[in-house]
C-alpha cells in the first residue's frame, strides 16, 4: 500500500522497522510470562476454577504493561523517532502486550477460530483505514499507515478481550495468584524468554 501511494523506499523501510521492533519487543516481554501463565491456566481449568481466569489475565497484562512500556518508552526516546511516531509505536506496543497475552488464554481454551477472525478483521481495518487516511485524505504516509496498523491491532485486542469475557466469568478473585506459578515454574519463564530471544 505504501508503494502504491508513492512513498519513498526509506519511508517504507522505516515503517517496517517500527512495526517489526514493536512486535518483537512486545513478544519478548510477554514471552517471560507466557509459559507459566499457560501452566496456571491449565491448572485452573483442570480444577474448574474458571473464576480465577479473567483476574489473572488483567493482573498479568498490567504487570507486563508497566514493565514493558517503561522499557520500550526508554528505547523510543533514543531511537530517533519523532514524538508522534514514538507515541504511535508505544500505543501499538501496549496493544500488542494485551494481544499476545489474550492469545495465550484463547489458545488454552482452543478458540483458534476466534483468534483467526480477530486477526482477519485487524488486517481489513488496517488496510482500509490506511487507504482512507493516506490516499483519500492525504495524510503523511508513515504516520497514516502506523496509525492504521495501530487501529487494526486495537480492534484485534478488543475482539480478543470480548471473547475472553464470553468464556470466563467475572469475579473479585486476586489478579496476582498467577505469580505463584511464575515463582514455582521460573525455569519455564526463562525458557520462554530465551526461546524468543533465540528466534
Label each residue range with its predicted role.
Residues 29-58:
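Transmembrane-helix boundary and interhelical linker motifs in polytopic inner-membrane proteins
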Residues 118-165, 180-184, 191:
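Hydrophobic alpha-helical transmembrane segments
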Residues 41, 106, 151, 190-197:
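Hydrophobic/aromatic residues within transmembrane alpha-helices of membrane transport systems
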Residues 31-35, 88-110, 115-123, 144-161:
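Short runs within selected transmembrane alpha-helices of multi-pass transporters and secretion channels
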Residues 18-26, 55-67, 74, 78-106, 187-191, ...:
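Alpha-helical transmembrane segments of multi-pass membrane proteins
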Residues 2-6, 74-81, 131-137:
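Juxtamembrane "helix-exit" motif on the non-cytosolic side of transmembrane helices
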Residues 1-29, 191-198:
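Signature of the first transmembrane helix
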Amino acid at each position: 500500500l505504501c508503494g502504491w501511494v508513492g512513498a519513498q523506499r526509506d519511508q517504507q523501510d522505516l515503517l517496517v522497522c517500527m512495526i517489526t521492533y514493536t512486535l518483537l519487543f512486545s513478544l519478548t516481554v510477554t514471552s517471560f510470562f507466557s509459559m507459566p501463565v499457560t501452566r496456571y491456566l491449565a491448572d485452573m481449568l483442570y480444577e474448574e476454577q474458571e473464576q480465577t481466569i479473567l483476574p489473572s489475565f488483567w493482573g498479568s497484562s498490567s504487570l507486563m504493561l508497566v514493565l514493558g512500556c517503561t522499557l520500550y518508552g526508554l528505547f523510543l526516546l533514543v531511537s530517533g523517532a519523532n514524538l508522534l511516531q514514538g507515541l504511535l509505536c508505544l500505543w501499538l506496543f501496549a496493544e500488542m502486550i494485551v494481544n499476545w497475552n489474550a492469545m495465550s488464554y484463547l489458545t488454552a481454551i482452543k478458540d483458534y477460530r476466534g483468534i483467526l477472525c480477530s486477526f482477519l478483521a485487524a488486517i481489513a481495518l488496517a488496510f482500509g483505514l490506511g487507504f482512507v487516511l493516506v490516499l483519500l485524505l492525504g495524510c503523511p504516509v508513515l504516520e497514516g499507515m502506523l496509525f492504521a496498523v495501530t487501529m487494526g491491532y486495537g480492534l484485534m485486542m478488543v475482539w480478543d478481550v470480548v471473547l475472553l469475557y464470553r468464556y470466563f466469568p467475572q469475579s473479585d478473585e486476586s489478579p496476582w495468584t498467577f505469580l505463584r506459578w511464575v515463582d514455582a515454574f521460573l525455569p519455564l519463564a526463562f525458557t520462554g524468554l530465551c526461546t524468543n530471544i533465540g528466534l
